[in-house]
Regions:
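Short, solvent-exposed loop/turn segments at secondary-structure junctions
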Residues: 38-42, 102-103, 139-141, 162, ...
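Conserved glycine-rich beta-strand-loop-beta hairpin in the small C-terminal domain of fold type I
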Residues: 312-326, 338-353
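Conserved core segment of the aminotransferase class I/II
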Residues: 98, 238-319, 332, 419
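Short amphipathic alpha-helices in soluble, non-transmembrane regions
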Residues: 362-368, 406-411
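N-terminal "arm"/small-domain region of PLP-dependent enzymes with the aminotransferase-like
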Residues: 2-75, 79-80, 85-86, 368-371
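Conserved core of the PLP fold type I
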Residues: 60, 66-211, 222-244, 359, ...
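Conserved PLP-binding active-site segment of the aspartate aminotransferase-like
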Residues: 351-356, 373-415
C-alpha cells in the first residue's frame, strides 16, 4: 500500500471513503472498551489471589518477633524492608515501606520539601519565590499532576533512545530554582525506554546549583519485562553516593503490577539519612502503614528470585496483548507512513506518535466508536502536547479478543484523522 503522503488527491479521497465505511461498521458494533490506564487484567489478578490464604493462624502474624497486628515501626516491618532492598539492589536501612501506593510516597516527599524542607534545604520550599522542575517528555501524567498541584513550574526535556536529553538537563540544573526531576528509568512511561548506563552515570554525578535537588527515580517497572529475560539495572542509590550525592536521589517502586493495584505495597528508597528524616516527618501523620499487608507480601513474594518467577507468569499473559497491538500497527499503520511507535519489551504501554495535530482528533473518533484511551496531551506537563501528536496505548486490561477490536478502531480512526489532515 502507498504512503498517504505519496497518494494523489483522488487516491486519498477514495481511501477516505473506504475508511469511513469501515468506521461506520465499527461504530455500529456498539463497543465499550477501555485502554485508558495500565491496569492488570483479570487473569493477572487471579494469578496472585492466593496471597490471601497465607495468614490464617495467630502465629502467622509474627515476623522477626513482631506481631504485625499491633502498632509498629513507621518505616515498615524489617522483613519487608529486606525484601524490597533485595529487589531494588540497595540496603534495608535505605528502604521505607509504606502503604498501597508509591505515588502517595512521591507526593509526600514533595510535600515535605514544601512544608519542612529537605536535609540540605536552606528553608522550606513554600517560602521560595519560584520552584522549577525538569520533566522528561513524553512522561507519566500522574507525576506531572503532583508537581502541578504545588504550583511548580515544569520544564519539558525531550526523551531520546538513551533517556532524557542530558545536555539540556545539565544546562537546566545550573539554575538554583530547579529543584527536581521526574524519571521512569526502566521501561519509561509511555515509551518503554531504558536509560543507558551513560545517562544514569551523568544523572548520578550531577552537581545541581540547588543543594536540595530531588532526583525522583520512579522505578515502577524494575522487574516488569514481558518480552525478554530480566534486565539487571544499576543501583542508583549507591551510584549517587559514589559521586558525593548520597542524599540527592529518591527511588520509588510498588507491587501494583506484581500483586494488586491499589492494594499492594509502595516503597521509597534513599540514603539512610533521608529515610530517617522522612520517617520522623511521616510519623507525625501516621503511626504506621498496613503491616499485615506488608507481611502478606513478604510471605507471597519471598525474595527477588521468586518474585522474578512470578513476573514471568505475568509476562506470559501480557506478551500476547502487546503483540496484538504491535501486529495491528505493523499491518495497518506502518505502511501508510502516518505514525511512528516504539516496540517495548517491558513496562505497560506503547507510545504512538501520530502526525502533528492529529492526536486529539484520533482519540475523539475512538471515543465516538466506543473505545476509551488515555487523553491526548496527558503525557506532557499541564496536559498540553505542543505537537498534539503523542498517544499512549495501554494494552494490559482487555482480553486479547477485545483488544483486537479496540486496536482495529484505533487504526481506523488514525487513518481518518491523517487523511483529513492531509486533505481530502
Amino acid at each position: 500500500m502507498k504512503k498517504y503522503t505519496d497518494m494523489s488527491l483522488q487516491e486519498r479521497q477514495a481511501e477516505y471513503t473506504a475508511v469511513q465505511v469501515e468506521y461506520e461498521k465499527l461504530k455500529a458494533m456498539g463497543l465499550s472498551l477501555n485502554m485508558a490506564r495500565g491496569k492488570p487484567g483479570k487473569a493477572q489478578l487471579d494469578l496472585v489471589t492466593p496471597i490471601f490464604g497465607l495468614l490464617t493462624k495467630p502465629e502467622d502474624f509474627v515476623s522477626d518477633g513482631i506481631d504485625v497486628r499491633n502498632y509498629g515501626e513507621v518505616a515498615g516491618i524489617p522483613a519487608a524492608r529486606r525484601l524490597f532492598a533485595d529487589i531494588l539492589g540497595c540496603k534495608p536501612e535505605q528502604v521505607f515501606v509504606g502503604g498501597n501506593a508509591s505515588l502517595q510516597l512521591m507526593y509526600d516527599a514533595v510535600s515535605k520539601a514544601f512544608t519542612n524542607g529537605l536535609l540540605h534545604s536552606e528553608k522550606p520550599w513554600c517560602k521560595l519565590d519560584k520552584v522549577k522542575w525538569i520533566c522528561p517528555v513524553p512522561g507519566y501524567d500522574r507525576h506531572f499532576k503532583v508537581t502541578e498541584s504545588f504550583g511548580v513550574e515544569m520544564i519539558s526535556v525531550p526523551m531520546t533512545a538513551d533517556g532524557p536529553d542530558m545536555d539540556q538537563v545539565e544546562a537546566l540544573i545550573k539554575d538554583p530554582a530547579v529543584k527536581g526531576m521526574w524519571n521512569v528509568p526502566k521501561y519509561s512511561n509511555p515509551e518503554g525506554v531504558i536509560y543507558s548506563a551513560a545517562t544514569i552515570d551523568r544523572l548520578a554525578k550531577m552537581k545541581p546549583a540547588a543543594p536540595d535537588f530531588m532526583l525522583m527515580w520512579d522505578n515502577a517497572y524494575c522487574i516488569h519485562e514481558f518480552d525478554c529475560d530480566y534486565v539487571a539495572f544499576p543501583d542508583i542509590i549507591s551510584l549517587c553516593a559514589k559521586y558525593g550525592n548520597a542524599d540527592m536521589v529518591y527511588e520509588f517502586a510498588s507491587t501494583s503490577k506484581v500483586t494488586f493495584p491499589g492494594a499492594g505495597v509502595g516503597v521509597m528508597a534513599s540514603s539512610a539519612d533521608n529515610i530517617a528524616y522522612f520517617s520522623k516527618l511521616i510519623n507525625i501523620q501516621t503511626i504506621g502503614f498496613d503491616k499485615i499487608n506488608q507481611l502478606r507480601h513478604v510471605l507471597f513474594l519471598k525474595d527477588k528470585a521468586h518474585t522474578l518467577a512470578l513476573m514471568k507468569q505475568h509476562a506470559a499473559i501480557l506478551a500476547p496483548k502487546f503483540h496484538a497491538v504491535l501486529d495491528a500497527l505493523d499491518k495497518e499503520i506502518a505502511p501508510l507512513g502516518i505514525a511512528g511507535y516504539k516496540r517495548p519489551v517491558g513496562g505497560y504501554f506503547i507510545s504512538v506518535d501520530v502526525m502533528p495535530g492529529c492526536a486529539k482528533h484520533t482519540l475523539a473518533l475512538c471515543k465516538e466508536a466506543g473505545v476509551t484511551m488515555t487523553g491526548a496531551g496527558a503525557t506532557f506537563p499541564y496536559g498540553k502536547d505542543p505537537q498534539d501528536s503523542n498517544i499512549r496505548i495501554a494494552p494490559s486490561l482487555p482480553p486479547v479478543a477485545e483488544l483486537e477490536q479496540a486496536i482495529a478502531v484505533f487504526c481506523t480512526c488514525l487513518k481518518l484523522a491523517a487523511l483529513e489532515k492531509l486533505g481530502v
